[in-house]
């Protein structure tokens, strides 16, 4: 057990990771040594940043808390604190059920931890973070919360209404990160396309992205978690005109059947969804689309599911994730619908959909053989350097593998490569 050392454990999404990075910077500014995502306690104090989005995430968070409680009981840890979405939603219940935790914080009051440690929040470091990602890329969170009322989603209950960060503050953070060596920015929010409506009374995402693109040193900008309804089409122009805005869009569509879109309260139709996809591909040639789909929402019939599969076959998404509906208390779906589709049927539909996408992804990968791409090198792993094209986001998308014996490559640098082979997920390349 190392004195004056604090372990930060982050569960859940990249938005949580940004919160952890901000906390880490504040702790370091107060004289602590900080470790991140250690397998076991390293220091006297541990802070677990939890996720509470769906059942599996909640279970993972609870198990991690209990694991560290056990370490505390064994004398391997002096203090244990918990923050994040799970404790934001269930703070009182958790405090009663797991008294071994010294204190639970919500998602937005983690700065109180500093006071409880006898330290102070340092406002001069408000936009600074200790990056846990490789030094050349960072996640950039532009807003908190969500004003959408999708039937199945607990995020608005947990995080509250949409709050945009001031544009100047975001630009200042970008400039600071660039000065520290960051070249690539993953722009994240619960709902990107709503950015600016609360602060500036209109959608400001295109203006924000254009301003980030104009910051010297920004090489790649990638957009995550857009919403299909009321999409700001000015963004198409920004993506066309700025080479450093990746031709990539992560837009969660969830379903295609009008029956399901209505039950999910998505405020977009099947026809509008197809029209938006066609616009993306017409206005931004070569764009790669990533989406997320859901199966097993209450009311999903076999006909709805077949319609969803046909949609996937027809559109042929470059990247796709899917998950089975999980009933979340407090949501519209939990109040109004019976969770009548069995776990077995949900899993069967999920497996079918992902098998279909794997086949499509494999076919799309084969079309890249012989083509040339610019890649950034993330790391060296065994006999390969691992890189990504502009069409690949870290952690979730395919990677480009380059034989390490070919030549020495620098982590965080860009190289031109030629694709020589492909499998269902990854590409293999040689340096040009």
Curated annotation (Swiss-Prot):
Domain MTTase N-terminal: 4-122
Amino-acid positions noted as binding [4Fe-4S] cluster 1 in the UniProt annotation, renumbered to this chain: 13, 51, 85
Domain of life of the source: Bacteria
Reactions that this protein is recorded to catalyse: L-aspartate(89)-[ribosomal protein uS12]-hydrogen + (sulfur carrier)-SH + AH2 + 2 S-adenosyl-L-methionine = 3-methylsulfanyl-L-aspartate(89)-[ribosomal protein uS12]-hydrogen + (sulfur carrier)-H + 5'-deoxyadenosine + L-methionine + A + S-adenosyl-L-homocysteine + 2 H(+)
Pfam family of the protein (one): TRAM_2
EC top class named in words: transferase
UniProt domain Radical SAM core: residue ranges: 132-363
The protein's required cofactors: [4Fe-4S] cluster
Keywords tagged on the record: 4Fe-4S, Cytoplasm, Iron, Iron-sulfur, Metal-binding, S-adenosyl-L-methionine, Transferase
Binding site for [4Fe-4S] cluster 2: 146, 150, 153
UniProt cross-references to SMART domains, sorted A to Z: Elp3
UniProt-listed GO biological process terms: tRNA modification
Family: Belongs to the methylthiotransferase family. RimO subfamily.
Keyword Transferase: yes
Free-text cofactor note: Binds 2 [4Fe-4S] clusters. One cluster is coordinated with 3 cysteines and an exchangeable S-adenosyl-L-methionine.
Protein's name according to its UniProt entry: Ribosomal protein uS12 methylthiotransferase RimO
Localization of this protein: Cytoplasm
Record's GO cellular component terms: cytosol
Domain TRAM: 366-432
Function: Catalyzes the methylthiolation of an aspartic acid residue of ribosomal protein uS12.
């Amino acid at each position: 057990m190392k004195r004056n050392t604090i372990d930060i454990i982050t569960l859940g999404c990249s938005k949580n990771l940004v919160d952890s990075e901000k906390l880490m910077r504040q702790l370091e500014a107060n004289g602590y040594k900080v470790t991140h995502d250690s397998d076991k306690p390293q220091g006297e104090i541990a802070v677990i940043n939890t996720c509470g989005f769906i059942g599996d995430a909640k279970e993972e968070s609870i198990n991690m808390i209990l694991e560290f409680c056990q370490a505390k009981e064994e004398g391997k840890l002096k203090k244990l604190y918990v923050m994040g979405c799970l404790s934001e939603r269930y703070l009182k219940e958790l405090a009663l059920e797991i008294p071994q935790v010294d204190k639970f914080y919500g998602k937005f009051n983690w700065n109180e931890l500093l006071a409880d440690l006898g330290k102070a929040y340092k406002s001069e470091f408000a936009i600074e973070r200790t990056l846990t990602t490789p030094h050349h890329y960072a996640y950039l969170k532009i807003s908190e919360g969500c004003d959408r009322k999708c039937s199945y989603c607990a995020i608005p209950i947990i995080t509250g209404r949409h709050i945009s960060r001031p544009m100047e503050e975001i630009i200042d953070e970008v400039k600071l990160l660039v000065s520290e060596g960051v070249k690539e920015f993953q722009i994240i929010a619960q709902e990107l396309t709503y950015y600016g409506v609360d602060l500036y009374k209109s959608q400001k995402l295109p203006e924000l992205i254009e301003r980030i693109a104009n910051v010297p040193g920004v090489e790649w900008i990638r957009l995550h978690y857009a919403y299909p309804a009321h999409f700001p089409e000015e963004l198409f122009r920004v993506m066309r005109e700025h080479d450093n805005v990746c031709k990539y869009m992560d837009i969660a569509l969830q379903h295609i059947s009008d029956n399901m879109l209505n039950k999910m309260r998505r405020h977009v139709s099947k026809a509008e969804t197809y029209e938006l996809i066609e616009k993306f591909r017409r206005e931004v040639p070569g764009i790669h689309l990533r989406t997320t789909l859901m199966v097993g929402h209450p009311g999903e019939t076999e006909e709805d599911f077949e319609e969803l599969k046909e949609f996937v076959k027809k559109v042929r998404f470059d990247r796709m994730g899917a998950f089975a509906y999980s009933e979340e208390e407090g949501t519209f779906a939990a109040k109004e619908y019976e969770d009548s589709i069995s776990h077995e049927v949900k899993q069967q539909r999920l497996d079918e959909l992902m098998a279909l996408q794997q086949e499509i992804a494999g076919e799309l990968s084969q079309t890249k053989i012989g083509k040339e791409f610019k890649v950034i090198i993330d790391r060296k792993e065994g006999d390969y350097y691992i890189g990504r094209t502009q069409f690949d986001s870290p952690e979730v998308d395919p990677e480009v593998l380059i034989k390490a014996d070919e030549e020495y490559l620098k982590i965080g640098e860009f190289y031109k490569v030629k694709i020589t082979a492909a499998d269902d997920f990854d590409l293999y390349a040689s340096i040009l």
